[in-house]
Amino acid sequence: MAATDSVSTLVVEGDIAVLTLNSPPVNALSAPVRQAILDGINAAVANPAAKAIVLICDGRTFIAGADISEFGKAPKGPALQDAQNAIENSPKPVVAAIHGTALGGGLEVALCCHYRAAVPSAKCGLPEVNLGLLPGAGGTQRLPRIVGAEKALDMMTTGQHVGAKQCLAMGLVDEIVPEGELRAGAIAFAKKLLAEGRPLKKVRDSDDKMVAARGKPELFAEFRKANARKFRGFLAPENIIRCVEAAVNLPFDEGLATERKLFLELLTSTHSAAQRYVFFAERQVWKIPDVPEDTPTVAVKKVGMVGAGTMGGGIAMNFANVGIPVTLVETKQEALDRGLAVIRRNYENTAKKGKLTAEDVEKRMGLLKGSMNLEDLADCDLVIEAVFENMQIKKDVFGKLDRIVKPGAILASNTSALNINEIATAVSREDGVVGMHFFSPANVMRLLEVVRGDRTSKKAIATAMQVGKKVGKIAALSGVCPGFIGNRILYARTVQAQAMLMEGAMPWDIDGVLYDFGLPMGPFAMSDLAGLDIGWSKETSKSSTIREVLCEMDRRGQKTGAGYYDYDEKRNAKPSPVTEKIVRDFMAKAGATPRVVSKEEILERCLFAMINEGAKILEEKIAIRPSDIDIVWINGYGFPVYRGGPMFYADTVGLKNVVAKLEAYGPKMGASFTISPLLRRMAEEGKRFQDVK
């Protein structure tokens, strides 16, 4: 006997009913899928021939989560809880058969099944935290009852995906069945349950792990303390913790009510709206209107790296990590040896944390070859230059590479600000020159700015984007302008920060406001970390800026124990009376009278200047879309994901309010400051950046 609808099939094989869901691409819990589960389970329960039920999915995965497109819309069809109740209250055992991923609502459905079987490659998780949400279909109440409060907290606040073997050890999965034999294995497991007379296991009725957690009253306080830095500013992790506290201390149904209340709080929050926006923006950023997905690319099987310093070594690690050999070229053996030693030390530190084996370290180091001869890059498919940020030096390198490297290979510059068009004039293959701006530390930071010159070919762009994806980066396309997307906006903020320094705000005042907003650090702490002497020369220094005076006093940042801040032996920063005196002296020379600069003004002038510059970047078509700017700032500069990026944040403030404030600050913004015509026009028309696709 078989019953079929558009997204499911129900068949009875012997005494086992098999309910198969088929809603490509990931069997998300849309209204038709929820209806299919409810109807299918009820039909199987009503069928006297069926003694047990297997819930399985066609395609590449089990239910991979909620249908995000339904968020914020009027509900259609049955509620997920109705389908879950049908499963949990079935008088016949229901077995979830898991392959691919059981994520979010998918795992929450599986948790309502009495037993769970999975293939070895399957993964389970509750990643709602990444969307600024919590598991809202009983996950916060059922998961702790299976794996315990501590493991549940860790899984839900990190959103991690757990492999089948670990799931079995945790009790999240009851049976591992052979790869490729899920259907037969799950049916066999169901028959085994019937033969052994195993009871119906309702997770909601399991209480032993909750009793154990009640015996550890310090558990939640310790978890909050241990993760305070990681959770700073986010709403969802705290709400997840409160839900697990409810699971431990309240009856199941009261815990569910708590979960629902806290879920709805998050669903209607700006934080979750921002994180969901970022989720889609990270998928949109790869789409380049005039470079379709089927654009031919260069097959990158060997990479050349010119420069083995901090950036060059970090970039090389990205390729070694994915099995692509790299030849690193330096001008001196000492620099080459030092660069390779730093790479090895980085890998060994990772191995000490248990994330790599000793064999992994040697395998990756084996893919890295050092050289002092550019000729060794002749057969590379992609060569990336990461030398000193000087135009003439870069052009000299590119001229040599053009003569050496095989035709058709891509020549890329890691420049953070210089003109790619000018660099390209040094070669005969201008169409093969592209910017690939990695962010430091390059082996850690997710962002890659791909910079398109006037003559850069679509093939070169497609190759650079594909390479970014291959090495695990998020690549955003930028046009040519000083600083590209990220650093150009950073400069606009820096101008305001420096101006407010000369109006009476101290570095720690400005940094403190931006830190409280959610950024990892402010501009002055960032300068101290990078080193104030970057681009500074003792020979040409004229005490004309606060930074020059600090460098002349050997206050060059964290590395010298002092910069804008004073640092102790552990590099903890504290306000510096020396810096304050220098600032006051500069103000006196300029005839400036110190005033109290409010926190509101600090935040608005810094952020609204960024927004204004972002609008100019859009006007000039340097960035394809506003969300690309947000992706750059979230992944390259630590802009808090729960704020959505500077352009999304502008929408939450209201573009009319942004323009009004910029007009009110007027001359304070600087003599050369102008409001973007695009920003002004969008404000007048009541538009939002997030509506610009």
Describe the residue ranges of each PLM region:
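Gly/Ser-rich catalytic serine loop of serine hydrolases
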Residues: G100-G106
